Amino acid sequence: MRCLKSLLAFFTAFPIGGAELSFKCVWALPYVAAPIIAAIPTTLLYLGASPAIAYIALLAATGLHHLDGLADVGDALLVRDREAARRVLEDPRRGTGGIFAVTAVVVTTAAHLHSPLQLLLGEVFSKSTALLFAGFSKSFKPGLGEAFTEAAKRQWPAALPALAVLAYLAPVTTAVSLATSALLYQLAYRHLGGANGDVYGYLLEVSRSAFVIWSAYVPVPTAF
């Protein structure tokens, strides 16, 4: 229970006290963290709130931590030199690349969002993908990203049942979303020479968006 509290304290904005930072339960990301994060946003969407409001609520539930990673990586991708790009990740100032990345992801995702199930499955996909990809990654610096990577190397198989369920419910959407997420992740991973917390935040955001966007175009169950 303590490690689950730690996981939720790190990946959500909910006030969970007395939790020491630990990734021992990182396997629970798709099964515990994702449904909890999506609970309020999906309820809002079900009750008639606009997709934009529901998506903003979901981002708020994550504490905007992953969105910050998206912005940092967006800035870093505009810098050609690897070492300079890594330094950009530490710069608190926001550049054109970061502003564009955040705006593009949020606006396009909200524009393609139209059902609570779509949002819930998108969040499960995001957490599953991050766990899976991190299991085969390396960190380029010490820190939380390194700790997440090391934990994922041991626990990445836990992502497979969640992805299998998604593939059963929406096979084409899941497949093309995995391919899209892999391409976008490799873009940042190769540019920076590895992963860190910002790169994983970027991955969490773009993978969720990929699933939501593709599910609006690819034939999926009528529940969508």
Swiss-Prot record:
<feature type="transmembrane region" description="Helical">
    <location>
        <begin position="97"/>
        <end position="117"/>
    </location>
</feature>
<keyword id="KW-0472">Membrane</keyword>
<dbReference type="GO" id="GO:0051073">
    <property type="term" value="F:adenosylcobinamide-GDP ribazoletransferase activity"/>
</dbReference>
<keyword id="KW-0460">Magnesium</keyword>
<comment type="function">
    <text>Joins adenosylcobinamide-GDP and alpha-ribazole to generate adenosylcobalamin (Ado-cobalamin). Also synthesizes adenosylcobalamin 5'-phosphate from adenosylcobinamide-GDP and alpha-ribazole 5'-phosphate.</text>
</comment>
<keyword id="KW-0169">Cobalamin biosynthesis</keyword>
<feature type="transmembrane region" description="Helical">
    <location>
        <begin position="21"/>
        <end position="41"/>
    </location>
</feature>
<comment type="pathway">
    <text>Cofactor biosynthesis; adenosylcobalamin biosynthesis; adenosylcobalamin from cob(II)yrinate a,c-diamide: step 7/7.</text>
</comment>
<feature type="transmembrane region" description="Helical">
    <location>
        <begin position="156"/>
        <end position="176"/>
    </location>
</feature>
<feature type="transmembrane region" description="Helical">
    <location>
        <begin position="44"/>
        <end position="64"/>
    </location>
</feature>
<keyword id="KW-1133">Transmembrane helix</keyword>
<protein>
    <recommendedName>
        <fullName>Adenosylcobinamide-GDP ribazoletransferase</fullName>
        <ecNumber>2.7.8.26</ecNumber>
    </recommendedName>
</protein>
<dbReference type="GO" id="GO:0009236">
    <property type="term" value="P:cobalamin biosynthetic process"/>
</dbReference>
<dbReference type="Pfam" id="PF02654">
    <property type="entry name" value="CobS"/>
</dbReference>
<dbReference type="GO" id="GO:0005886">
    <property type="term" value="C:plasma membrane"/>
</dbReference>
<dbReference type="GO" id="GO:0008818">
    <property type="term" value="F:cobalamin 5'-phosphate synthase activity"/>
</dbReference>
<comment type="similarity">
    <text>Belongs to the CobS family.</text>
</comment>
<keyword id="KW-1003">Cell membrane</keyword>
<keyword id="KW-0812">Transmembrane</keyword>
<dbReference type="InterPro" id="IPR003805">
    <property type="entry name" value="CobS"/>
</dbReference>
<keyword id="KW-0808">Transferase</keyword>
